[in-house]
Amino acid sequence: MGKVHVLDHPLIQHKLSYIRDKHTGTKEFRELVDEVAALMAFEVTRDLPLEAAEIETPVGPAKVKKLAGKKLGLVPILRAGIGMSEGILRMIPAARVGHVGLYRDPETLKPHEYYVKLPNDVEERELLVIDPMLATGGSVVEAINSLKKRGAKSMRLICLVAAPEGVAYVQKEHPDVDIYLAALDEKLNEKGYIVPGLGDAGDRLFGTK
């Protein structure tokens, strides 16, 4: 069973409080999501392997540690996942970026795929799947299904907030995927929104309704 990591770092929790606040405007919301994503990247990549190397500093040789050739990939789920991708890319700029486009039917709440573009060597990469909200889990499960069909073998899921129902569904369908959250919230309401949540992440990121 994949592990669930709730990242309780004070800076993450402080910034998340403003992300949740309904009075936070689009510009500040976008900046805060970017900042929290960057902070989360530190924890998500904590166990990446290192290898010894030698370099020359301005005053002489030094033994250092570098990432051990691990290939990484980011896969934001469109559209809201885009809001987190730049923050993570600043931490791991060599990562390749793919995209999965899904929309959720407002009546059935079921996800529908409309776009997939991935690195050619997706099967060789550790993929960081990004979506700010893990509500029912339907969209994330569909995205991971799509990635696995195209050869992906190793994935981690990164979300700002999640409902227990969504976490349980992802764990049931994809027990090999670890989940990283800034917060695990109380529940879903009757409309499928996370409570207390932060509203519609896509609308708040892009100033739409």
UniProtKB/Swiss-Prot annotation:
Q: EC top class, in one word?
A: transferase
BP terms from Gene Ontology: UMP salvage; uracil salvage
Keyword Transferase found:
yes
One Pfam family, please name it: UPRTase
Record field: catalytic activity:
UMP + diphosphate = 5-phospho-alpha-D-ribose 1-diphosphate + uracil
Pathway listed? Pyrimidine metabolism; UMP biosynthesis via salvage pathway; UMP from uracil: step 1/1
What's a single GO MF annotation on this record? GTP binding
Record comment: activity regulation: Allosterically activated by GTP.
Textual note on the cofactor: Binds 1 Mg(2+) ion per subunit. The magnesium is bound as Mg-PRPP.
Question: Which domain of life does the protein's organism represent?
Answer: Bacteria
Which parts of the sequence bind 5-phospho-alpha-D-ribose 1-diphosphate?
R79, R104, D131, P132, M133, L134, A135, T136, G137, G138, S139, D200
E.C. code? 2.4.2.9
Q: Which cofactor does it need?
A: Mg(2+)
Q: Does the keyword Magnesium apply?
A: yes
| Residues binding uracil | I194, G199, D200, A201
Extract the signal peptide range.
none
Record's keyword terms, sorted: Allosteric enzyme, Glycosyltransferase, GTP-binding, Magnesium, Nucleotide-binding, Transferase
InterPro entries referenced in this protein's UniProt entry, alphabetically: PRibTrfase_dom, PRTase-like, Upp_B, UPRTase/APRTase, Ura_phspho_trans
* HAMAP family, per database record: Upp_B (MF_01218_B)
Similarity annotation: Belongs to the UPRTase family.
Give a short account of what the protein does: Catalyzes the conversion of uracil and 5-phospho-alpha-D-ribose 1-diphosphate (PRPP) to UMP and diphosphate.
Q: Which NCBIfam families match?
A: PRK00129.1, upp
Instruction: Kindly provide the name given to this protein in its UniProt entry.
Output: Uracil phosphoribosyltransferase
Annotated source species: Shouchella clausii (strain KSM-K16) (Alkalihalobacillus clausii)
The coding gene here is upp
